[in-house]
């Protein structure tokens, strides 16, 4: 079969042949980098429309697990940051909760989008994503509270 389903089957076959633990190597499969830099003559290069599948083929189950642990850590800390900014808003200490909620929702949308496209393959997307993730962590954990100034 062709299309996305056919490319997924070819990708999984390649993973079976090359080794599930470590994959085929970064930049060797499934994206613009692999298509533009075809370094192995006997390998067929093609694009796969799923960032998680691309990551698994390139880095194996080990790399996918490491990425998913990073994502889960971000999601947990993002929820904590939302809770803290919501509590600060209730106490009248901060007005950052709506901004943080919007950032978190947008970043979660990117994670969903990665299931259908290699969105992280674009350098600017990766830079925006992790910059906003850092801003969310700053707002929830690292920002200093305002101190009252007495004259």
Report residues per predicted region.
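Generic recognition of well-ordered alpha-helical segments
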Residues: 7-10, 51, 55, 61, ...
